[in-house]
Amino acid sequence: MSEPQFARILSDLGRSLGIPALAPSEAGLCQLAFDGRHLVQVMEQGARSQILLSCAVGAGKMDGAQALMAAQSNFLQAGGGAVACAAPDGSMHLQLGVSRADCSADTLLSAIDALLNQVETWEKRLVRAEPDIDALRRDPAFMMQSV
């Protein structure tokens, strides 16, 4: 997908959201705020043939227990297609890739909705989660045992 195609998809998405001037920045990034709480970043990933969506989960840096939960979620593919990761600043983000070949404004809007649903699920999970000191000492190979 070329930059003009990415810009066209964002423009189409903007029209469906009531933001007709939606376009990528010079750096190729588009940021959308939802509910005044979530900032979704939309960027083209040419090397992976994807449009990547990224959204922070909660505030602050991930602690060890949260990092373990994220790793387990990724291992079990429990994120509904979203991948939990640590941003360079240490905050937790969920990311979701959308295939460029299948990408349209409707597809992108559905993917954003799915990502935001996962972010909200994670935020609830992190509020409920109590620090689990023993979790850091558990053997991760337990998850890989066959029965």
Identify the residue ranges that each predicted region occupies:
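Short, Φ-rich (hydrophobic/aromatic) sequence segments
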Residues: L13, A65-A71, I112-L115
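Short, highly charged C-terminal tails/helix-capping segments
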Residues: L126-V147
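Charge-rich, low-complexity N-terminal segments
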Residues: M1-V40, A87
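Ampiphathic alpha-helical segments that act as solvent-exposed interaction surfaces
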Residues: S73-Q77, R100-E130
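Short, internal acidic amphipathic alpha-helical interface segments
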Residues: S54-G97
